[in-house]
């Protein structure tokens, strides 16, 4: 959005909040509702790379003496966006707080993937209304994926007028300007860009810890699965340059980080938008094998883009872990076609075969949707049989949630909710059964564990994760937090392992 558009939007919002407003005029200037037809045209738009994020003089000490609070919903990408916003707040002079009561600014970084996630946000906005009454100077903001939906922003502006600012996923780097506008405006400041943003490098970050780190390698998704809102809320696929990614990871390694997770809505489409070089995720992973860091993993991958070169590189091992999250969504080819996943059951099983052949100790996890419109009993049984055939270690399972603006939301659905819930229960029973069977096989084995910190259930116990993302609890000195250690597994549960410390710490070669 350019300056002319911004001025136009401010003129549209010039009336008081108590007056009736024609919100459609506002959205004409800054926002476009989800449109499959229009979204698919976007590939022709140029994406620029901005390498220098800097704060103008007017923002020096802007937040001195003030505190911020960010509540994050949803995926790892949102977690990383929160780290960036925390970095910007800190650069402005704000201090973090863990209580909304102490905050001068409260941001809700939202998720739009399912209706339940949106309901949680509106519930929290209701709680914040009372806080705003007690503290009128408090600034409340809504950002993230929900902000990219026109219906959501309309609801906020009509029914949650205590919200001071709304901004989307493409203009996080403009947070200082949005804060300033919200601070001095009597109106709700809304800055939602329908065009996806450019790639902004060197944004400040306040990472949640000093052991593991998220690193974005790309943004957006061009797959347009019929049920998914992400291509609309996150924009088209845009890859960061490999040299920028490698430099960031080398810097993290030099600062003592032990594990990196490469992030992207469709991470293995990385590089497909490059016009000057042929370079994909397999090439990037091959270069990252040479970086002196203990572990590198990635999420989330799409089976359609999981190529043989990537499998070959992952098979080389080293710091590339053996855990692969590979969402299948359904085991029925007919359902997959309606979902527009662009692969079949047979293609997925062949991909799994190739992965297991190249990486014999690979651990696979997945995502599955049950109760997609008109899913038959036979199609659901195909999902159950595929789960058994692949032998997943675990899965994230969901009942289909319609998202406004997606093709699936317009489909007639003859599957009663009671049937959907029963299918989910049956699937979860299978997931739990296989999870404990898989974990039982670790009994007596010695595994490498990266120690995250104290167990959530017992501060006297340490907790960490294996290379295959298994949670391990064991008793050991707290001085080992952040270290790689050897643990012998003594007991297996559905979602975790218990063990005894064998050796500490492990030197990374």
UniProtKB/Swiss-Prot annotation:
MF annotations from Gene Ontology: 4 iron, 4 sulfur cluster binding; metal ion binding; N6-isopentenyladenosine methylthiotransferase activity
UniProt cofactor note: Binds 2 [4Fe-4S] clusters. One cluster is coordinated with 3 cysteines and an exchangeable S-adenosyl-L-methionine.
Principal subcellular localisation of the protein: cytoplasm
Transmembrane segments: none
MTTase N-terminal domain residues: 66-184
Top-level EC class: transferase
Basic and acidic residues bias spans: 16-25
Chemical reaction(s) catalysed: N(6)-dimethylallyladenosine(37) in tRNA + (sulfur carrier)-SH + AH2 + 2 S-adenosyl-L-methionine = 2-methylsulfanyl-N(6)-dimethylallyladenosine(37) in tRNA + (sulfur carrier)-H + 5'-deoxyadenosine + L-methionine + A + S-adenosyl-L-homocysteine + 2 H(+)
Enzyme Commission number, as recorded: 2.8.4.3
Record bears the keyword Iron: yes
Residues annotated as binding [4Fe-4S] cluster 2: 221, 225, 228
Entries under PROSITE patterns matching the protein: MTTASE_N, MTTASE_RADICAL, RADICAL_SAM, TRAM
Gene3D superfamilies: Methylthiotransferase, N-terminal domain, tm_1862 like domain
Metal-binding listed as a keyword: yes
Annotated region (Disordered), positions in chain: 1-26
PANTHER family: CDK5 REGULATORY SUBUNIT-ASSOCIATED PROTEIN 1, MITOCHONDRIAL TRNA METHYLTHIOTRANSFERASE CDK5RAP1
Known role: Catalyzes the methylthiolation of N6-(dimethylallyl)adenosine (i(6)A), leading to the formation of 2-methylthio-N6-(dimethylallyl)adenosine (ms(2)i(6)A) at position 37 in tRNAs that read codons beginning with uridine.
Family that this chain belongs to: Belongs to the methylthiotransferase family. MiaB subfamily.
Protein name per Swiss-Prot or TrEMBL: tRNA-2-methylthio-N(6)-dimethylallyladenosine synthase
């Amino acid at each position: 959005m350019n300056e002319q558009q911004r001025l136009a939007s401010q003129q549209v919002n010039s009336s008081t909040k108590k007056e009736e407003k024609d919100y459609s005029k506002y959205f004409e200037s800054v926002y476009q509702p989800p449109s499959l037809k229009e979204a698919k045209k976007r590939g022709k738009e140029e994406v620029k790379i901005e390498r220098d994020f800097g704060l103008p003089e007017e923002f020096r000490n802007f937040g001195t003496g003030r505190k911020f609070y960010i509540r994050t919903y949803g995926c790892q990408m949102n977690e990383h966006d929160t780290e960036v916003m925390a970095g910007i707040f800190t650069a402005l002079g704000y201090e973090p707080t863990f209580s909304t009561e102490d905050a001068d600014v409260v941001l809700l970084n939202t998720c739009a993937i399912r209706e339940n996630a949106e309901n949680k946000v509106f519930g929290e906005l209701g709680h914040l209304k009372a806080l705003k009454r007690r503290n009128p100077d408090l600034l409340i903001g809504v950002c993230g994926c929900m902000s990219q939906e026109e219906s959501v922003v309309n609801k906020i502006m009509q029914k949650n007028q205590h919200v001071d600012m709304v901004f989307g996923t493409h203009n996080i780097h403009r947070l200082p300007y949005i804060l300033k506008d919200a601070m001095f405006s009597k109106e709700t400041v809304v800055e939602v860009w329908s065009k996806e943003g450019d790639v902004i490098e060197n944004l400040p970050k306040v990472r949640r810890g000093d052991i593991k780190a998220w690193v974005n390698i790309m943004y957006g998704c061009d797959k347009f699965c019929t049920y998914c809102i992400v291509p609309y809320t996150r924009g088209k696929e845009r890859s960061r340059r490999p040299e920028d990614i490698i430099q960031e990871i080398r810097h993290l390694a030099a600062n003592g980080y032990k594990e990196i997770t490469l992030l992207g809505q469709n991470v293995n489409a990385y590089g497909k938008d490059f016009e000057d070089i042929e370079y994909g995720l397999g090439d990037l992973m091959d270069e990252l094998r040479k970086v002196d860091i203990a572990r590198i993993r990635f999420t989330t991958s799409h089976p359609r883009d999981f190529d043989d070169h990537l499998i070959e590189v992952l098979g080389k091992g080293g710091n590339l872990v053996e855990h692969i999250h590979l969402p299948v969504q359904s085991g029925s080819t007919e359902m997959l076609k309606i979902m527009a996943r662009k692969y079949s059951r047979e293609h997925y099983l062949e991909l799994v075969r190739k992965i297991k052949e190249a990486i014999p100790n690979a651990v696979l996890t997945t995502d599955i949707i049950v109760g997609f419109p008109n899913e038959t009993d036979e199609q659901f049984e195909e999902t159950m049989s595929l789960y058994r055939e692949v032998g997943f270690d675990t899965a994230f399972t969901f009942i289909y949630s319609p998202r406004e603006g997606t093709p699936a939301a317009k489909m007639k659905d003859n599957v009663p909710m009671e049937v959907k819930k029963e299918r989910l229960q049956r699937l979860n029973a299978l997931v739990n059964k296989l999870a404990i069977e898989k974990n039982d096989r670790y009994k007596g084995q010695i595994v490498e564990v990266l120690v995250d910190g104290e167990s959530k259930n017992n501060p006297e116990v340490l907790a960490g994760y294996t290379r295959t993302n298994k949670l391990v609890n064991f008793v050991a000195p707290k001085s080992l937090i952040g270290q790689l250690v050897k643990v012998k597994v003594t007991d297996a549960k559905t979602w975790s392992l218990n063990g005894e410390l064998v050796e500490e710490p492990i030197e990374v070669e």
